[in-house]
């Protein structure tokens, strides 16, 4: 691929990232992305054989952004010897991303619209989950738990359940349902309750 082709391909992804941020997932048509990039309607097909492949490239940017934010915040937000505090930071970054980057967040987890093997999307998204698994494992070890909890679940399963809980909080908070149900305007207590539910109450 020539330098010009590489530049145009990146431009199409850049436009998609900008578009989903401003107008949401529903705005990401090939035609609209091409129009805003200043190319013909058929030009994106030269670099992305399907609409899904272009959406996957856009979603990859989202995972890269979220991973960078989480890594930086976890490193700065809590001592390594306190993985529970780091999990709290991780959860806040995740929920903040879902709130401030709603369109991108929705795209990232719409696997019916994405091709996981396309353009390294799987390789970009999985490290974030591995970070969560590592933090969960260390938090359980730090609290004196064995490699298995009372339910027989491994850290990877506990992390999966916690992720599902965080995702549910993010979605319901974004829709306004949790604010209505709880009467609260701070997601922090919900995050702490989720951590306690999956890891047990904090002991220190």
Regions found by a protein language model. Name each.
Residues 6-14, 21, 26-27, 47-71, ...:
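An amphipathic alpha-helix adjacent to DNA-recognition modules
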Residues 1-7, 203-204:
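N-terminal intrinsically disordered/low-complexity leader segments
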Residues 28-35, 44:
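Append "Primarily bacterial transcriptional regulators
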Residues 116-144, 156-160, 185-196:
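Amphipathic alpha-helical packing segments from all-alpha helical-bundle domains
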Residues 99-116, 171-179:
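Amphipathic alpha-helical segments used for helix-helix packing
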Residues 38-48:
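Short hydrophobic/aromatic patch on the recognition helix
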Residues 71-104, 129, 149-152, 158-162:
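Hydrophobic alpha-helical connector segments
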Residues 138, 163-181, 196-204:
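Amphipathic C-terminal alpha-helical segment
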